[in-house]
Amino acid sequence: MPTIQQLIRRGRKTKASKTASPALERCPQKRGVCTRVYTTTPKKPNSALRKVARVRLSNKIEVTAYIPGEGHNLQEHSIVLIRGGRVKDLPGVRYHIVRGSLDTSGVADRRNSRSKYGAKRPKEAAAK
């Protein structure tokens, strides 16, 4: 426990907060190029083939990013936009690819939560 005099002289050290997505370097999104697109399996007790991509960002950092939604058009050398946000059952995946921007297409036939998946508003039925 410091004395008042010691606090006047030195002050207290502020704890530096650790960011959940360090590769973004305080930017909301970053652009990158896919170096590998593949599927991986989640932790127990879940079971699936989750689509992920290894992405080299514009700041030369390479990260693993999740491809959300059903179906995608990504392959090696596709240019993608990355945002923060981890996938709880995939260890080491701390970023999401933004659907509907740059080379990434939006999810086809998506009706709900469209803005999260880059899907356009569906046309109303003609017979109305």
Curated annotation (Swiss-Prot):
InterPro entries tied to this protein: NA-bd_OB-fold (IPR012340), Ribosomal_uS12 (IPR006032), Ribosomal_uS12_bac (IPR005679)
UniProt KW keywords: Methylation, Ribonucleoprotein, Ribosomal protein, RNA-binding, rRNA-binding, tRNA-binding
Keyword tRNA-binding: yes
A GO CC term assigned to this protein in UniProt: small ribosomal subunit
Entry GO MF terms: rRNA binding; structural constituent of ribosome; tRNA binding
Record has Disulfide bond as a keyword: no
Segments for region (Disordered): 1-25, 101-128
Positions bearing 3-methylthioaspartic acid: 89
Disulfide bond annotation, renumbered to this chain: none
Pfam family of the protein (one): Ribosom_S12_S23
GO biological process, one term: translation
Subunit structure: Part of the 30S ribosomal subunit. Contacts proteins S8 and S17. May interact with IF1 in the 30S initiation complex.
UniProt function note: With S4 and S5 plays an important role in translational accuracy. Interacts with and stabilizes bases of the 16S rRNA that are involved in tRNA selection in the A site and with the mRNA backbone. Located at the interface of the 30S and 50S subunits, it traverses the body of the 30S subunit contacting proteins on the other side and probably holding the rRNA structure together. The combined cluster of proteins S8, S12 and S17 appears to hold together the shoulder and platform of the 30S subunit.
HAMAP family recorded: Ribosomal_uS12_B
Family: Belongs to the universal ribosomal protein uS12 family.
Name of this chain's protein: Small ribosomal subunit protein uS12
Organism of derivation: Chlorobium phaeobacteroides (strain BS1)
Highest classification ranks of the organism: Bacteria, Pseudomonadati, Chlorobiota, Chlorobiia, Chlorobiales
